[in-house]
Amino acid sequence: SEMCIRDRSPINSPKTIADNKYSEIQDDKFQLQPGDIIVTKGPVMWGFFGHCSIAIDDKTILQIEGPGDKPTTQSFESFKYNYASGKNDWMKVYRCSYPGAGKKAAEWVKKNYENTNHRYLVTLNLNSKKFTYCTKIIYQAYKFGVSEKSVKSYGLHIISPYAIKDNFIDPYKLRLVKAY
């Protein structure tokens, strides 16, 4: 078998750890798909660990970051730099295994959250859109954009970023497609 040897020569210009790590992750040939769910370490807010966003096409993610914020879109490349290039950062990309589900979820998010004034607030109501948070957008995208059968059903509930994958039901289960 052939072995690939990477050039480990010293870098001439002084760079930060983030720049070095980012140069490794930026041209990784990974192809994002609409509906992909990106989970990161993120800041710890309100006792929540982690952060997540959803791909609305093959280059763009939509997220809502924190108190007072509205949903924003960002290129996947810059999102990777922000959330996956730090020394202790990590990022996982999950994909719904059900054919066509990701595209439907992405369309729903574009229609219901892109360029809206919905605000960040963690509430127990998983059905409302006026106040939302990172995982709630993803949960709704699959529940309302794909199928009520794709995710677990709750009364009043909060879903944390690290628990998002556990809320999907067969045959809609998420699979890990990329880790940074």
PLM region spans:
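A structural motif
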Residues: A84, Y98-N117
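Glycine-rich catalytic cores of cysteine/serine-nucleophile enzymes that process amide/ester linkages
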Residues: F30-C96, R119-K129
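Sec-exported extracytoplasmic/periplasmic mature domains
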Residues: D57, G66, K110-E114, Y139-S147
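Low-complexity basic/metal-binding stretches
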Residues: D7-R8, V93
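Short, small-residue-biased leader/transition segments that mark boundaries at the very start
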Residues: S1-I5
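Mixed-charge, Lys/Arg-rich low-complexity intrinsically disordered regions
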Residues: N12-F30
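Extracytoplasmic/secreted envelope proteins and their assembly/folding machinery
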Residues: L32-D36, G50, G102-A106, K110, ...
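Activation targets extended, charge/polar-rich intrinsically disordered C-terminal tails
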Residues: S9-T16, L124-Y180
